[in-house]
Amino acid sequence: KKSNCIAVGGPYSNNLVGLAQILNEYQIKKKFLLIENNRIKMIGNYFLLKLLCKEEELMFINKESYLDAENFACNLDKNTFFIPEGAACVESIAGISTLVFDILKNEKDYQKNWSHWILDAGTGWTAAAVVWLNAYLQLEKKISIIMIAGDANSFQNSLFKVNEYFNLNGFYLSNHVYNFDLHFPTIGKSFGSMPQKIIQYIENFAKNNGILLDPIYSAKTFYTAEHLFGNEKENTLIIHSGGANALHGFVSNFFK
């Protein structure tokens, strides 16, 4: 049994903030490996990480070590559980799969039938689990995935690993016909890019809908969904990864 946790990510990672909260709650020892950033500022998620972590729990590593982070982590401590960037590991699949069952419960509770599910993808693991369960449970939902990061090959790799996980646990598809399509952002196509138009979109969306979006993931998801599927609002569900915390890191981009 591993006694502590080492995770890797960027200094502004949403994933690390959430992970730090859980590990602190359960009193699990941790160390976060952050890729070196010469322009880092005490804003956004990095500010939250500093609140949640002791100085010795945050360690900056160079790009070479970051690319081989698992071996680097194991050399630091053999008795550790390693969590890769974005928690893209098989141990996360059971948890992320609950998303589908939560949605189905909401459909039942609110007497809705969302026939078209739209969600973003970074590492693609959550989206892959949704696609797999849609096939396994024969939900017949149309799944549209907006690839904020990664590409078609990386998503297929995530889907392969998700299928492998379920097979190892005794769950098999009668056939491997997946009902999904991949799309890419129609604005700010490069990961991390923030055109002024998306900043204005976030401001308008907050005022008109009361929902806070971030410029990296959720805003591009909604913007792209509107442009691709604007006429399908009635039975469409957009599943996004939040972003209110991350917004604090982009204050200087707003209200110019």
Give names to the regions the model predicted:
Residues 1-22, 26-35, 113-123, 142, ...:
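A short, small-residue-rich loop immediately preceding and capping a beta-strand
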Residues 12-19, 123-130, 219-222, 246-247:
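Short glycine/serine/threonine-rich phosphate/pyrophosphate-binding segments
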Residues 14-63, 153-165:
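Active-site-proximal loop->helix
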Residues 30, 56-58, 82, 143, ...:
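Hydrophobic beta-strand scaffold residues
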Residues 33-35, 61, 83-86, 120-121, ...:
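Short beta-strand segments
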Residues 35-110, 179-201:
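Small/polar-residue-rich loop-to-helix segments that shape phosphate-bearing ligand pockets
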Residues 93-181, 240-256:
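Glycine-rich phosphate/pyrophosphate-binding loop at beta-loop-alpha junctions
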Residues 178, 183-234:
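Active-site-adjacent helical/loop segments in soluble small-molecule enzymes
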